[in-house]
Amino acid sequence: MSALFSHAIRNEWAARNPITSVRTSAKRLSTPDILTASEFQALLLELSQRERVMVLMAAATGLRRGELIALRWRDVDLEEKLANVTHSVLHNVEGNTKTEASGKPVPLPTLVIDELKLWKLKSLYRSEADYLFPSIAKNGEQPIQPDMILKRHIRPALVRAGVKKRIGWHSFRHGLGTMLRQKGVDIKTAQELLRHANSRITLDIYQQAVTEEKRRAQDMAFNGFLEVGSTQHPSAPSEPD
């Protein structure tokens, strides 16, 4: 039952998990760790290309992990700098994202677009129907396992970077929200960028179009992560997963 409510919260169909009122451990109720600008930069420098693109996309867009790995090349418009988030993957099962906010186009910063173009050139799977981040072990027929990426690549990279925080995929989404607040972005624009669908969470109705105001706000917030220095560096190839 708790898992069902957790799934509903991840997709923002529910605001809270009532089961947690019975089990009130600090771990369940704590806010996820987020990275500072310098920590985020240090992490990027330790990641190989695939993982770096995944982290950049997660941090820039606030996509949930299931939405991130469900993306196919046909969902990304590299010219218009948009991602159409229409599906999500949970426990290897791909389904539609039916909420009002989740189906709206997501703006992509120029840096992310540049990294995606480079990744597409390198990836073995680059047709329109292919996943952006496919599992090599599954011959590209399934997306990569996000928890495996965390365990094998991102968390070891954090250790190498000297970052002692416990980071999960939701940390990047939470970090974007924090950076938006720190940069003084108005609540309506921030909620639209984070695509909160539940009225108890969003407090307002979303606009359909990706506006220039939202794009400027996203660029302002995301650039805050990159003020420390450049992300360009020689990358070792990722190991097949």
Located regions from the model:
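Non-catalytic DNA-binding core/recognition domains of DNA-processing enzymes
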Residues: 1-7, 22, 108
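C-terminal flanking helix
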Residues: 2-5, 9, 210, 214
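Basic, Lys/Arg- and aromatic-enriched nucleic-acid-binding interface segment
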Residues: 10-71, 79, 101-103, 111-112, ...
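Catalytic-site neighborhood detector that most strongly recognizes the C-terminal catalytic loop/helix
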Residues: 26, 34, 51, 89, ...
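C-terminal secondary-structure termini that scaffold catalytic or DNA-interacting sites
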Residues: 80, 91-114, 118, 124-127, ...
